[in-house]
Amino acid sequence: MEAAEAFYVGGGQPPRFQVFERAAPVELRALLKRRGYREDARMDVQTAPLTGLAGRAAAEWVIEEAPIPGDRWWSIYSTVEHGSIRPAEGTDVETAFRGTLLRPSDPTIFVTASRDGVTAAAGQGVAQGEWLGVQCLATLPKHRRLGAARTLMAALGHLGQDRR
């Protein structure tokens, strides 16, 4: 956490954390509170039946799934989320981000969408009983509005149904 804080402060940005309750390590909320962080915004949660998601794929996208975030997944997500202050590969900050994503207590799947050999979008699904939490959904700007995120959601819907 110290490395992440130093990284953002060094880049002139305030460190902030988004916590998805069921996918976060159980000790994270208490650690953030001890370090002086406070909750300042809540997020909306949208729900849909998994069956409604599963049929919305765009055929031209190739979906790959993995139990951990691979290099292409990480590249898409960190580029969209961190842009010009993206953590350098192999740094403590990058390792911390990867470690956080790898630690949910529920079954997790990571997906990427590629077209014409170019990986353009990434997402994460966390199976929670009858629920599938979707987070870290990211599409590179020049590939937006082409069906990549919709196809990722469809793939995650199928995977969520399979994991029930």
Model-found features: residue ranges?
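Conserved acetyl-CoA-binding loop-helix of GNAT-fold acetyltransferases
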Residues: 1-5, 136-141, 145-162
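Acyl-donor-binding surface of acyltransferase catalytic domains
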Residues: 2-72, 82-85
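Hydrophobic helix-cap positions at the C-terminus of alpha-helices
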Residues: 7-8, 101-104, 159-160
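Short, high-confidence coil segments that cap the C-terminus of an alpha-helix
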Residues: 12-13, 162-164
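Conserved acetyl-CoA binding element of GNAT-fold acetyltransferases
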Residues: 20, 130-141
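A generic local structural motif
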Residues: 33, 96-99, 153-155
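Short loop segments at secondary-structure junctions
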Residues: 50-53, 116-117, 142
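Flexible, substrate/cofactor-facing loop regions flanked by secondary structure
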Residues: 59-132
